[in-house]
């Protein structure tokens, strides 16, 4: 086979085939996923606003990341609720959109109308309220989007002819791949907007920067609009499919079966509802009472409750599938639980390497585009290889992407800059180093989600999505805890001044950031690979 034919075959199997597999029914959940991706629109504003105006420590911010992650564990009762109210689940998208809009409006008020907002609550209090409202809104929408991905893959074509099992499996994998693609596509859109919005920002005065920050929060109100539009599109497509089936001469009985094939009567599972209620009361109680080691207690308690519910739920599966899905979930959990460096790395890049808002936007754009390319290129790899092999590859890639950050902390960029007449400087290295919030974790979720969409019992699809997503999302809480510990052991501080009085509240100290970066790199490489090795030696061995 010639090189040209090989390249043509590769492009066909990765890029063109993805386009061929696309169906209009995939679009409504994809719109909700895009809205979730676009949620990062305010991320760079957040980094600079927190750094310059909020006197919150790196450890506190990592801790806030923990609490912001807890609503994602609410996917359990919400997922089961979706199964119970399947035909009316779209209303939950409106609830989520309202919470997201409220969170955005609070931040807009905080930036543009600071004095008015401060007369009600402290700046830090408003920030915490906003930071906790948004994830609740996104989790509500995400649960519905997951359920919509199941509906997006029909069992028959528009003539009522049944698809083969293999065809349905391919459609589910494509739907889940496009779901991750949509989320990261949202990141790309965000980065493009930020690059444009922050053009020449370093030359602007403080008040002009504040004005741009506020404008970005106003633009972020497009997020709830997009997700709500997805619901209306789903209603339209359902009506159109019904008309096409009638036109094809499908009988009334078959028509009723096809249009309600996902509306299976589900009995309330009181273990799931009761366990979820215990979880919510437990989490809020510990948080409100300000118990010592609250985050650790909540994490351990949440893990035990979710594991108990998983044990109850997987009894619905055949024995072989039970062990396999547990092994798969554990491997993904460990991979996603590896700690990050915390906000100290971004502060160091701003203060010492002089990265500005526009350059951060450029970095996140490059990271997101490369991840999109990665998903397209690795789709055949993901379809043909086990999750164990995928996680090993992602761990190696993730740790390699941290090396430039470690190097730059120790002045590697000064050496390369002097060697190349200023060409390979800190910014050049940072562009190559796309590890900044790189969403590789999204890739690891695709095989698990596709497996659930295809194999979970029809009456518990949303519940399965929710329980296993809650478990893998708990890993992000473990990630936040790990980051908090690293930032408590090795303390990193940045300069902060009061927004109203301009009094300096704290000074910068990055002397211990290097140890944090080295620790993160080693953990990212070694721990997931060790977990894969242990699982593959046990009865939980996964070939999925």
Predicted regions and their residues:
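Intracellular loop-helix junctions on the cytosolic face of multi-pass helical membrane proteins
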Residues: 1-24, 116-118, 122-128, 152-341, ...
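Helix-loop boundary and gating motifs at the non-cytosolic
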Residues: 3-72, 133, 279-295, 324-353, ...
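Conserved glycine-rich helix-kink/hinge and helix-boundary motifs of the Major Facilitator Superfamily
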Residues: 30, 62, 94, 170-173, ...
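Substrate-agnostic recognition of the 12-TM MFS/MFS-like secondary transporter fold
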Residues: 32-33, 66-72, 126-197, 338-341, ...
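Transmembrane alpha-helical segments of major facilitator superfamily
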Residues: 64-72, 223, 303, 362-371, ...
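Helix-to-loop junctions at the C-terminal end of transmembrane segments
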Residues: 72-88, 198, 373-393, 413, ...
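Transmembrane alpha-helix termini and helix-breaking/packing motifs in multi-pass membrane transporters
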Residues: 80-86, 111-117, 184-211, 283-293, ...
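C-terminal ends and interior cores of transmembrane alpha-helices
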Residues: 97-121, 396-423
């Amino acid at each position: 086979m010639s090189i040209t034919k090989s390249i043509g075959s590769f492009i066909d199997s990765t890029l063109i085939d993805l386009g061929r597999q696309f169906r209009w029914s995939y679009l409504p959940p994809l719109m909700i996923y895009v809205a979730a991706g676009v949620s990062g629109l305010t991320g760079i504003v957040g980094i600079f606003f927190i750094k310059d105006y909020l006197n919150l420590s790196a450890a506190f911010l990592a801790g806030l990341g923990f609490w912001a992650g807890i609503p994602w564990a609410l996917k359990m009762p919400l997922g089961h609720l979706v199964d119970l109210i399947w035909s009316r689940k779209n209303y939950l998208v409106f609830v989520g959109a309202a919470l997201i809009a409220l969170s955005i409006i609070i931040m807009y008020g905080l930036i543009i109308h600071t004095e008015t907002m401060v007369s009600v609550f402290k700046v830090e209090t408003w920030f915490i309220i906003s930071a906790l409202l948004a994830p609740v809104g996104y989790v509500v929408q995400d649960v519905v989007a997951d359920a919509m991905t199941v509906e997006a893959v029909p069992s028959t074509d528009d003539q009522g002819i049944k698809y083969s099992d293999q065809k349905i499996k391919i459609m589910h994998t494509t739907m889940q791949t496009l779901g991750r693609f949509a989320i990261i596509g949202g990141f790309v859109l965000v980065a493009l907007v930020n690059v444009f919005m922050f053009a020449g920002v370093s030359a602007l005065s403080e008040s002009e920067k504040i004005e741009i920050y506020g404008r970005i929060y106003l633009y972020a109100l497009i997020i709830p609009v997009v997700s709500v539009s997805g619901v209306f599109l789903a209603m339209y497509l359902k009506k159109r499919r019904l008309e096409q089936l009638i036109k094809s001469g499908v009988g009334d009985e078959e028509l009723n079966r096809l249009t309600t094939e996902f509306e299976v009567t589900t009995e309330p599972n009181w273990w799931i509802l009761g366990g979820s209620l215990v979880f919510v009361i437990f989490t809020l109680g510990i948080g409100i009472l300000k118990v010592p080691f609250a985050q650790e207690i909540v994490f351990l308690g949440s893990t035990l409750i979710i594991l108990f519910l998983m044990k109850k739920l997987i009894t619905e599966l055949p024995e072989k599938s039970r062990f396999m899905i547990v092994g798969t979930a554990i491997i993904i959990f460990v991979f996603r639980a590896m700690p990050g460096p915390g906000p100290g790395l971004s502060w160091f890049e701003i203060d010492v390497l002089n990265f500005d808002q526009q350059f951060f936007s450029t970095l996140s754009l490059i990271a997101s585009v490369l991840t999109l390319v990665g998903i397209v290129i690795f789709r055949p790899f993901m379809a043909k290889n086990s999750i164990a092999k995928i996680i090993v590859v992602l761990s190696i890639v993730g740790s390699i992407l941290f090396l430039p950050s470690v190097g730059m902390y120790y002045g590697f960029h000064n050496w390369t800059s002097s060697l190349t007449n200023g060409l390979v400087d800190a910014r050049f290295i940072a562009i190559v180093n796309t590890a900044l919030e790189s969403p590789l974790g999204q890739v690891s979720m695709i095989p698990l989600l596709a497996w659930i969409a295809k194999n979970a019992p029809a009456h518990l699809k949303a519940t399965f999505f929710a329980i296993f997503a809650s478990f893998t999302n708990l890993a992000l809480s473990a990630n936040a805890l790990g980051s908090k510990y690293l930032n408590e052991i090795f303390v990193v501080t940045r300069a902060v001044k009061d927004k109203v009085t301009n009094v300096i509240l704290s000074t910068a100290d990055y002397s211990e950031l290097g140890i944090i970066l080295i620790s993160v790199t080693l953990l990212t490489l070694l721990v997931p690979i060790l977990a894969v090795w242990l699982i593959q030696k046990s009865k939980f061995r996964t070939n999925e």
